[in-house]
């Protein structure tokens, strides 16, 4: 309850100070607070003032005086000179002041000038004899002639960084430093007050002794009466008698007043100001409180009424010099320096305060009088600089040392009012105008601080630290003061700015005073610190415009910006107080920090992260820090989190800056850690926490200055910080959770405001300005922005708009290019990864660093610099890496050491600095290498210190050992000084180092260990709890010490030490002004969220699961909602998926019994997110819709529906629990299993889950109308989704619908909620454009495909019916030509028909089509195609009813009624034909097939009517037909599909009648309409339709398409024969169109002929003959050439070359006729004939001899085939045995038994296959060659052919025949070859080609004789060949033996007959020429048997011989 009392006291105190302030400023708060003080003085003194009348008159006079008697704002030259005398007066005053204030003052400080305003100068209390908090720092500066000396007495001038000195030691050092500065006579900022530094003579003034401030009569009289009454009262006081000087001065003044008689006309018109002042000053110097009070009261009123001339100069007190203003030093006497009356009055009034012993009434009058001197409306007030500061000091001292709480309050209020008035005097507009003019001179002005730092950095860095910050501030003051020229025009604005600076500096110095560890809150030091901190807070808060303006400068040579001038002091304030354990101090310091963050972060861009990361975050994580500190800091963090611009700019300027800490990331991680803390809390504790949420955490109300009087403060610093009634961690957890949500809310706010920005004009200008222009115009631009904002906003709360203005007003703002920052962040992250690699394995990191550009190369210098300059490296890893012994690492180590500068350092300091950069390894060799290089570097930079480097090396090593020995806890016996001396004997080149030197080293190491400060700091932070535990023991049970506080104080010092190092590094390399990036782009939010979203997710998830209260869970849900919104907006898919997944988990829909209200709220949030962010959810829609499905299930269950009938989709996704549970249960139903087997954990879990029920309360929530409406809106508002989003939505919805169906696949009433919604969504989105519907239906179509083919018919019928309804709606929408949306949405019907074998489904779809056609036929466009494609599938059905319905629908409905509709659609006609084609090919229903063919035939007529011109058609009909044909190629698009339908039926239909009718219909159509076809179309018909009919023949020698010989026989007897004949007939009919494709026809016939099947071959031969003979008269030369080529090809293909190729000896073919024989042999002389005859006789004898041996040989072309029982004449398959026949013998009719007789048992299958293939090939080719010979014979027997064939082609044919004859003759003559073929088992018997030889010879001779007879011109060429062949044949015949070669003789006899008949028909001449040779042979023929035919031929020949020769004889 003490905390609550504290709050009440604080509120009461606030009220008191408020009332006091109100009283003090009741007339005019900003101008006349002295009236209020005057009334307070009356009450305090208890006296009746006698000046009531003059006081009232003075009030009137004051008003008039303000308007009429105000002096000019600018000082006259005389006034400026008048101010030069006050320095010496101040010095004199100080001496008196020292005597009067405290007789026992400590003289160590010399003079009170050396003390600061801060109370800590006297906090040791009066018993020590020190000054009682006289705020003298600033006033004594002026008193010593320096106006504004450097006052920071809290800086530590020592160079030591240990920070171990006590507060008193620091004060003594600071005071000594200030004393030295003042004795040195530094100019400080005296020039800014126009007070000369060393002037000893006051300049002459134009004022006279007797001239005073003139006024009207009434004012003058009132003033005289006031003064006279006061002086008379004083004179009557008994105490005045003790001071003769005062008494005399009063008497002189009264005497002077007596000269003016109010009753006479001698009315005064002026008051002698000096005379009056001297009297009152003398009165104030008395020791009488009453006299002082009266004098001070009079002075207060005089200055309040401005009755005295403040510009007059007066002598110091007790001076004997004249006050004549015109006196000069001509008489040789130097007068003492003079002061202005205002300055002298302030000195006099201030001297009246004597510390704690001062009378209360005097204290009050002092405050009143000082406020009267300072607070005035006139902006030209002369109270500036030192006087102002002295007045402030005095009032401050009254507040601190007064024993009267009321006086303390009044002093505090007055002080606040005075300071506020100082800042109110700064004219921002004037500053702006002056700044604009200055900017034209030099736009690159920098502050003196920056210039000084830059100049110092050029030589040796002067780092900013906490311990030497005071000294740095003093140095800066000197630098700024030195820039002030002696003669510069000081304006009132300059004075106002300088006063503001001085006041701020004074307050900062007071704040910086350290406090003792144990202090009373009512002590002077604490109250002083609190007041100064609150004043600084008020200054910044109430006058933030002054700090924001970069156009307010301190006057000087280099005009320093105001914010830069106070920067170091503000740093000092924060760094000295940020870690204070006192709650009020900590709070106000943190509030100041917040002001910097909220308003000045652009100016303190480098300081803010230092304080946050080095002080506040470490403190907040200390276990010893107070709960108030943690909670209050977290509350400030929450403010940051609530400010979008601050967050974004933190990220840009810190997290994306490689040289800055990741402030944003650190903050979020800190909040996440707190949010993840597991805290158990009772309901009672929670209620306590809820109660205090609305209460303020702060000790004081910061909206106004708190009353800090001693009576209003408690003595204990912990009052008000009572023990919390709830866990601290819980409070932190809840606030951190709020912070996380606030961050998200701010990011979302920034993103959406930026998406629709009302961008500030200045922002646009700024972002559009180039870099150079931005630098030039930065000052003026930022000032204009600030001015415009300030005029429109009176308050400066951190609103969004104000924040933007403030950020823009920074000096160094640059454009925030999102890409630039993204790259910076990526590079920073990459560097962090490289550092992590280095800390783990240093050597692996170097190549990575080079690759990523962090190192330019692997040179030692580059690596060494990187190791020194990079933060975050593990010092141990650096030491190990540098200490490696290989050459590369040693070189890097040397380069590393060479980077250090040890110049001027002692060896210990150098070693200490050196060892701060790495941890020294433990190995001696590594240490040795380090020390060797260190010694070399040290000696090089410090020559003369040691004689050689060895000395430094040994000494360094010795110091390392000493440091380890003295400070290691493991070493008990420490090294003594003597041992250390002995260790270092003779190391300096054989000599000892000086003993004093070594002793100093020893002592320094002993007192200050060399250690890594960073590791020490971290160890201290992590071990703060251990400090408390170490200090506690059993013996201090009764100890009253606060060990936790002591531990915290110890750690806080370490924090300060670390912060000092950070500031040191912060300013080390500063080369110019910092660039601050103001946020303006929405893309920054994306980068931030991508970086931090995992932390957000981690922070929001556990609290929701851990707590059930609405507030906490709603916060988590809000955070998730915003996160999803951000992730969706910026397409951060991983984040969006994760957050949606978390929200889905929060719904907890899988566990019915565990659903709570928070889960229902999660459902609501999820639905709201879906509605608001639907356009960006993409893949997350599925999770959401799955939840919707589960919610609908819960709603059904809540209504009483059995849960088993509504399966859970989510459970079915993993496994069907119900099925698995029931199956497991059913599997264990045996009798013994009931008791013998226990359920497994899985089964128990399934049973428990199955038995869950929904609570009534949750059922009510689940079924609420709000939830139902939200669920419905998900679908009804889908029409508002974008085109891409609706596709994502439908994808998800279809996926969920499929899962629903799968989960209830076997149910009688399957779950189809999502399926129904999918249909509904289609209706809702029916108005979408086709562009959006196309991808939409692509998804839905696939879903319907799956659903409509489901095994559950209920699902299928629902899907089909839904499709039907949707299709009816879609068909109502007009579809333009060229679009195919109807095709798309009707496609699922086709898929369903194709993949569903259910008859009912197919019938239902056919009925749907019928419905479409009957009702929407006119609207159907592209939809015809899927309808007809579907009907094609139904046409293939094996169910007659399906095929029948298809046939009726197509024939009766479509073709009859809607043929033209179909015909007009692209591709639809071909699909219509395809339906008929499929029906014709359906082998089960011949009748339907024939009906379909009939329909096709009729449709052919319809198509012909449409396509071809008919003279009987009207013009309208022609136009109608043209419209139908528009866009169509009548041949390609119309006729070809029709003809192809017939063709396909011909090729594939199984029914013979169908095939035959199709063939007839096709050729009928071709014959009927072929005349309309063009040549190109005919070519296509032939190649695509006609020739493919015979495609089975494309491979020569085999027909393997048919499964059986019966199939082949049927095909041959029907289709092939009929088709070939029709084809030839068609060719003949349309010869003109088809003749150019003769090659194709001939090639087709060649394929027919070259088949093993004898039937096919003979059909082909017959058709070829028919083709040639029917068109013989139409062929041209080209055609005959093609025919010749065909015969060439046929003879070549049918030549059995295998007979020679497979000779085992490979001897090849041997010619049986000598090649030397020429055509002229027959015409040679008889000698040659006789020689030839002899040769022939010998050949004949050989032939006869061989013939006897081969009589039993087998004729391949005749006998072999004939042995097959006439198979070649049948149409029943292969004519020769196959491999299969050989391996698996069949009946004799299908195989050759002789083959297997000679087969070897060990012959492999491969050999058998090869042998049979060879034999088959030989037989087939020989047979076919005989057919070709026969064909030629028949052709030449035709007179037309013989007449039409060109001679060239006829000769070509004779060559073929001659070649065949010679081939067979050569083979027959090579008896050895034939024998070898038998031995090689190529054939079974010795083969011969007798039939081929005789047939070829016969046909050849016949053709040649015809040619001879028909062509007289060519006889000469022909006769020679003819005679040669005839002679050869006859000679061969004659040589045959009648007894042994009867078969050969019989074979050749017909040839001999033909030869003789031919000879008979020779011309007489030719007969005469060639008959002699033949005559001899004929005579030999008679030796043989001569049958009748031969006898008749011989008779004719001999008769012709007789006629020729006998007649001549």
Swiss-Prot record:
Q: Which residues form the SEC7 domain?
A: 824-1010
* Region: C2 domain-interacting region (CIR), residue numbers: 1836-1883
Bias type Basic and acidic residues, positions: 37-53, 1724-1751
Is Membrane among the key words of this record?
yes
**What positions carry the motif HUS box?**
653-657
Locate residues linked as Glycyl lysine isopeptide (Lys-Gly) (interchain with G-Cter in ubiquitin): 797
Q: Where is the composition biased (Low complexity)?
A: 134-143, 155-165, 210-220, 771-788
Keyword list (alphabetical) reads: Cytoplasm, Cytoplasmic vesicle, Golgi apparatus, Isopeptide bond, Membrane, Phosphoprotein, Protein transport, Transport, Ubl conjugation
Per its UniProt record, what PROSITE patterns does this chain match?
SEC7 (PS50190)
One GO biological process term: endoplasmic reticulum to Golgi vesicle-mediated transport
Q: Locate the region HDS1 domain.
A: 1017-1220
| Transmembrane residue ranges | none
Location(s) in or outside the cell: Cytoplasm; Golgi apparatus; Golgi apparatus, trans-Golgi network; Cytoplasmic vesicle, COPI-coated vesicle membrane
How does it associate, per the subunit comment? Answer: Interacts with ARF1. Interacts (via C-terminus) with RSP5 ubiquitin ligase.
Entry function? Guanine exchange factor that acts as an activator of ARF1 at the trans-Golgi network and is thus involved in vesicular budding and traffic between compartments of the Golgi apparatus. Activation of Arf (ADP-ribosylation factor) GTPases is essential for vesicle formation via recruitment of cargo adapters and coat proteins necessary for Golgi trafficking. Also plays an essential role in ER-to-Golgi traffic. SEC7 also acts as an effector of two Rab GTPases, YPT1 and YPT31/32.
Could you identify this protein by its name? ADP-ribosylation factor guanine nucleotide-exchange factor SEC7
Q: Which organism is it from?
A: Saccharomyces cerevisiae (strain ATCC 204508 / S288c) (Baker's yeast)
């Amino acid at each position: 309850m003490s905390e609550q009392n504290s709050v009440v006291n604080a509120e009461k105190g606030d009220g008191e100070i408020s009332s006091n302030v109100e009283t003090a400023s009741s007339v005019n708060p900003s101008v006349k607070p002295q009236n209020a003080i005057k009334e307070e003085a009356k009450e305090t003194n208890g006296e009746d003032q006698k000046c009531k009348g003059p006081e009232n008159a003075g009030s009137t006079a004051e008003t008039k005086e303000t308007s009429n008697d105000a002096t000019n704002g600018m000082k006259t030259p005389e006034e400026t000179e008048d101010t030069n005398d006050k320095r010496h007066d101040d010095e004199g005053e100080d001496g008196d002041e020292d005597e009067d204030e405290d007789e026992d003052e400590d003289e160590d400080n010399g003079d009170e000038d050396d003390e600061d305003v801060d109370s800590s100068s006297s906090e040791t209390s009066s018993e020590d004899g020190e000054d009682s908090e006289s705020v003298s720092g600033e006033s004594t500066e002026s008193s010593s002639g320096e106006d504004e000396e450097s006052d920071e007495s809290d800086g530590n001038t020592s160079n030591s960084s240990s920070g171990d000195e006590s507060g008193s030691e620091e004060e003594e050092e600071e005071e000594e430093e200030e004393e030295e500065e003042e004795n040195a006579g530094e100019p400080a900022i005296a020039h800014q007050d126009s007070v000369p530094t060393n002037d000893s003579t006051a300049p002459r003034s134009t004022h006279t002794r007797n001239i005073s401030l003139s006024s009207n009569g009434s004012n003058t009289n009132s003033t005289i009466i006031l003064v006279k009454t006061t002086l008379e009262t004083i004179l009557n006081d008994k105490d005045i008698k003790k001071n003769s000087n005062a008494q005399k001065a009063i008497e002189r003044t009264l005497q002077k007043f007596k000269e003016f008689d109010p009753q006479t006309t001698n009315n005064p018109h002026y008051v002698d100001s000096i005379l009056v002042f001297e009297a009152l000053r003398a009165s104030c110097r008395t020791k009488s409180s009453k006299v002082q009070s009266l004098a001070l009261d009079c002075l207060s009123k005089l200055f309040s009424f401005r009755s005295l001339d403040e510009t007059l100069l007066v002598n110091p007190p007790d001076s004997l010099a004249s006050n004549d203003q015109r006196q000069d030093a001509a008489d040789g006497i130097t007068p003492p320096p003079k002061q202005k009356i205002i300055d002298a009055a302030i000195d006099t009034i201030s001297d009246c305060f004597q510390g704690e012993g001062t009378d209360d009434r005097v204290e009050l009058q002092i405050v009143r009088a000082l406020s009267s001197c300072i607070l005035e409306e006139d902006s030209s007030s002369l109270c500036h600089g030192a006087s102002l500061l002295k007045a402030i000091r005095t009032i401050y001292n009254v507040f601190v040392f007064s024993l009267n709480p009321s006086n303390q309050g009044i002093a505090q209020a007055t002080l606040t009012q005075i300071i506020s008035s100082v800042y109110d005097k700064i004219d921002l507009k004037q500053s702006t105008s002056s700044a604009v003019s200055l900017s034209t001179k030099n736009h690159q002005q920098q502050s003196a601080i920056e210039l000084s730092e830059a100049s110092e950095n050029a030589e040796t860095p002067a780092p900013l630290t906490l311990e030497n910050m005071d000294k740095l501030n003093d140095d800066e003051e000197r630098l700024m003061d030195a820039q002030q020229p002696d003669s510069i025009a000081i304006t009132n604005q300059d004075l106002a700015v300088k006063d503001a600076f001085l006041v701020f500096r004074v307050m900062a110095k007071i704040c910086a005073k350290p406090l003792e560890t144990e202090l009373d809150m009512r002590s002077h030091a604490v109250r002083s610190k609190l007041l100064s901190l609150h004043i600084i807070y008020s200054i910044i808060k109430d006058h933030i415009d002054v700090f924001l303006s970069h156009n307010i400068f301190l006057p000087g040579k280099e005009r320093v910006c105001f914010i830069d001038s106070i920067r170091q002091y503000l740093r000092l304030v924060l760094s000295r107080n940020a870690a204070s354990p006192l709650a009020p101090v900590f709070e106000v310091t943190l509030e100041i920090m917040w002001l910097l963050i909220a308003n000045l972060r652009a100016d303190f861009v480098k300081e803010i992260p230092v304080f946050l990361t080095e002080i506040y975050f470490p403190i907040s994580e200390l276990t010893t820090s107070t709960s108030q500190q943690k909670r209050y800091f977290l509350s400030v963090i929450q403010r940051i989190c609530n400010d979008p611009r601050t967050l974004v700019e933190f990220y840009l300027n810190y997290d994306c800056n490689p040289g800055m800490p990741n402030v944003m990331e650190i903050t979020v991680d800190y909040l996440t850690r707190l949010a993840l803390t597991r805290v158990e809390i009772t309901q009672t504790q929670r209620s306590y926490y809820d109660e205090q949420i609305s209460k303020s955490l702060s000790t004081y109300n910061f909206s106004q200055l708190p009353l800090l009087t001693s009576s209003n403060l408690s003595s204990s610093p912990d009052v008000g910080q009572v023990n919390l009634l709830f866990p601290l961690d819980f409070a932190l957890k809840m606030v951190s959770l709020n912070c996380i949500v606030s961050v998200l809310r701010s990011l979302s706010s920034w993103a959406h405001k930026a998406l629709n920005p009302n961008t500030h004009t200045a922002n646009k200008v700024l972002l559009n300005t180039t870099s150079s222009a931005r630098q030039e115009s930065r000052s003026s631009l930022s000032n204009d922005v600030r001015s415009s904002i300030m005029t429109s906003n009176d308050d400066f709360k951190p609103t969004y708009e104000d924040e933007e203005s403030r950020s823009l007003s920074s000096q160094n703002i640059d454009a925030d290019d999102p890409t630039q920052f993204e790259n910076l962040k990526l590079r920073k992250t990459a560097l962090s990864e490289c550092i992590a690699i280095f800390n783990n394995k240093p050597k692996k990191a170097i190549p990575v660093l080079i690759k990523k550009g962090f190192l330019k190369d692997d040179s030692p210098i580059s690596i060494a610099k990187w190791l020194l300059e990079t933060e975050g490296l593990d010092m141990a890893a650096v030491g190990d890496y540098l200490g490696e012994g290989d050459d590369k690492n040693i070189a890097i180590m040397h380069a590393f050491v060479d980077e250090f500068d040890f110049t001027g350092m002692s060896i210990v300091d150098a070693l200490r600095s050196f060892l701060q950069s790495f941890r020294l390894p433990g190995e001696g060799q590594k240490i040795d290498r380090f020390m060797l290089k260190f010694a070399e570097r040290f000696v090089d930079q410090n020559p003369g210190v040691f004689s050689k480097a060895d000395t430094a090396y040994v000494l360094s090593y010795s110091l390392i050992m000493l440091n380890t020995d003295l400070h290691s806890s493991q070493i008990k016996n420490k090294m003594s000084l003597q041992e250390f001396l002995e260790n270092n004997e003779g190391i300096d080149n054989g000599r000892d180092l000086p003993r004093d030197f070594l002793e100093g080293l020893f002592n320094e190491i002993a007192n200050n260990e060399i250690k890594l400060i960073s590791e020490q700091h971290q160890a201290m932070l992590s071990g703060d709890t251990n400090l408390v535990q170490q200090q506690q023991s059993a013996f201090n049970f009764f100890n009253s010490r606060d060990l936790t506080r002591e531990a915290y104080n110890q750690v806080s010092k370490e924090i300060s030490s670390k912060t000092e190092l950070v500031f040191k590094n912060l300013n080390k390399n500063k080369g110019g002004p910092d660039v601050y990036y103001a946020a303006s782009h929405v893309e920054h939010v994306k980068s931030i969220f991508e970086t931090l979203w995992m932390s957000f997710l981690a922070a929001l998830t556990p609290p929701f699961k851990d707590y059930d209260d609405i507030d906490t869970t709603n916060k988590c849900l809000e955070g998730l909602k915003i996160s999803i919104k951000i992730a969706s907006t910026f397409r951060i898919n991983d984040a969006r998926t994760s957050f949606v997944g978390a929200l889905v988990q929060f719904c907890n829909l899988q566990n019915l019994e565990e659903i709570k209200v928070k889960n229902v709220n999660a459902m609501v949030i999820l639905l709201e997110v879906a509605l608001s962010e639907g356009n960006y959810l993409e893949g997350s829609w599925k999770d959401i819709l799955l939840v919707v499905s589960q919610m609908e299930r819960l709603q059904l269950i809540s209504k009483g529906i059995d849960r088993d009938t509504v399966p859970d989709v989510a459970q079915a996704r993993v496994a069907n629990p119900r099925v698995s549970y029931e199956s497991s249960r059913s599997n264990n139903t045996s009798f013994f299993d009931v008791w013998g087997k226990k359920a497994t954990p899985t089964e128990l879990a399934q049973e428990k889950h199955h038995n869950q029920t929904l609570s009534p309360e949750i059922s009510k929530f689940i079924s609420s109308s709000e939830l139902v409406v939200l669920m419905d809106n998900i679908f009804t508002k889908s029409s508002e989704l974008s085109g891409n989003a609706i596709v994502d939505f439908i994808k998800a919805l279809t996926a969920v619908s499929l899962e629903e169906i799968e989960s209830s696949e076997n149910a009688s009433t399957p779950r189809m909620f999502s399926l129904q919604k999918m249909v509904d969504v289609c209706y809702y989105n029916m108005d979408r454009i086709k562009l959006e519907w196309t991808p939409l239906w692509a998804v839905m179509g696939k879903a319907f495909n799956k659903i409509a083919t489901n095994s559950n018919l209920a699902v299928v019928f629902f899907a089909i019916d839904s499709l039907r309804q949707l299709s009816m709606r879609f068909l109502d929408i007009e579809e333009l030509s060229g679009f195919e949306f109807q095709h798309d949405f009707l496609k699922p019907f086709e898929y369903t028909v194709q993949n569903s074998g259910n008859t009912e489904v197919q019938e239902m779809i056919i009925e749907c089509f019928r419905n479409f056609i009957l009702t929407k036929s006119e609207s159907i466009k592209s939809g015809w195609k899927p309808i007809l494609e579907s009907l094609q599938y139904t046409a293939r059905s094996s169910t007659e009813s399906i095929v029948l319905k298809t046939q009726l629908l197509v024939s009766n409905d479509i073709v009859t009624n809607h043929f033209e509709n179909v015909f007009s659609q692209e591709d639809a006609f071909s699909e219509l034909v395809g339906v008929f084609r499929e029906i014709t090919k359906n082998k089960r229903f011949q009748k339907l097939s024939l009906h379909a063919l009939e329909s096709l035939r009729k449709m052919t007529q319809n198509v012909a009517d449409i396509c071809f011109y008919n003279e009987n058609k009207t013009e309208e009909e022609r136009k109608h037909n043209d419209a139908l044909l528009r866009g169509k190629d009548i041949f390609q698009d119309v006729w070809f599909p029709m003809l192809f339908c017939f063709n396909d039926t011909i090729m594939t239909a199984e029914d013979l009648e169908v095939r035959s009718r199709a063939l007839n219909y096709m050729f009928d159509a071709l014959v009927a309409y072929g005349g309309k076809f063009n040549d190109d179309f005919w070519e296509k018909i032939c190649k695509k339709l006609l020739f493919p009919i015979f495609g089975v023949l494309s491979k020569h020698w085999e027909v393997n398409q048919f499964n059986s010989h019966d199939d082949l026989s049927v095909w041959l007897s029907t289709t092939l024969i009929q088709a070939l004949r029709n084809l030839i007939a068609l060719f003949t009919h349309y010869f003109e169109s088809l003749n150019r494709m003769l090659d194709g026809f001939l090639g087709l016939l060649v394929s027919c002929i070259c088949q093993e099947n004898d039937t096919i071959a003979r059909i082909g031969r017959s058709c070829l003959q028919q083709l040639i003979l029917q068109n013989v008269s139409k062929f041209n030369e080209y055609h005959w050439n093609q025919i010749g080529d065909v015969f060439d090809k046929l003879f070549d293909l049918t030549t059995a070359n295998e007979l020679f190729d497979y000779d085992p000896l490979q001897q090849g073919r041997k010619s049986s006729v000598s090649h030397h024989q020429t055509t002229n042999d027959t015409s040679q002389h008889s000698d040659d004939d006789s020689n030839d005859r002899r040769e022939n006789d010998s050949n004949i004898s050989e032939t006869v001899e061989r013939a006897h041996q081969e009589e039993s040989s087998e004729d391949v072309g005749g006998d072999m085939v004939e042995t097959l029982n006439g198979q070649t004449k049948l149409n029943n398959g292969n004519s020769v045995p196959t491999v299969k026949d050989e391996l698996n013998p069949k009946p004799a009719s299908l195989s050759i038994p002789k083959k297997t007789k000679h087969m070897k048992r060990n012959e492999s299958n491969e050999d058998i296959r090869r042998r049979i293939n060879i034999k088959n090939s030989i037989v087939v080719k020989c047979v076919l060659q005989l057919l070709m010979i026969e064909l030629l014979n028949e052709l030449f027997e035709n007179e037309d052919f013989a007449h039409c064939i060109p001679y060239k082609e006829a000769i070509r044919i004779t060559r073929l025949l001659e070649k065949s004859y010679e081939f067979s003759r050569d083979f027959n003559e090579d008896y050895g070859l034939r024998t070898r073929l038998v031995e090689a088992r190529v054939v079974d018997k010795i083969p011969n080609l007798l039939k081929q030889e005789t047939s070829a010879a016969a046909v050849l001779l016949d053709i040649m004789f015809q040619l001879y007879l028909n062509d007289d011109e060519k006889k000469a060429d022909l006769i020679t060949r003819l005679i040669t062949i005839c002679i050869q044949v006859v000679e061969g015949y004659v040589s045959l033996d009648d007894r042994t070669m009867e078969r050969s003789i019989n074979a050749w006899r017909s040839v001999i007959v033909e030869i003789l008949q031919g000879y008979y028909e020779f011309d007489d001449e030719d007969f005469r020429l060639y008959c002699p040779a033949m005559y001899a042979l004929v005579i030999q023929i008679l030796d043989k048997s001569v049958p009748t035919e031969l006898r008749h031929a011989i008779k004719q020949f001999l008769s012709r011989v007789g006629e020729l020769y006998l007649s001549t004889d």
